[in-house]
Amino acid sequence: MKVNCKGYPTKFCFGKPLPHCASDGKTYPNRCRFCNAFVKSHGLITLRYYGKCK
């Protein structure tokens, strides 16, 4: 799955909680946190699905 991470990273993350389960096995609480991690990983992590990782 793809997430639009244009404009990231950002210093502050606000917004509605919408958990993102990433390929690194971590649950990110919202798109902002996921996109910050995505950019930091140089695009190596991907979105597995929306929701908490199981």
Swiss-Prot record:
It is found in: Secreted. Its main location: secreted. Expressed by the venom gland. Gene3D superfamilies: 3.30.60.30. Pfam families: Kazal_1 (PF00050). The keyword Secreted applies. Residues 1-54 form the Kazal-like domain. Keywords: Disulfide bond, Secreted. Disulfide bonds join C5-C35, C13-C32, C21-C53. SMART domains: KAZAL. May form disulfide-linked dimers or trimers (in vitro). This is Kazal-type inhibitor-like protein.
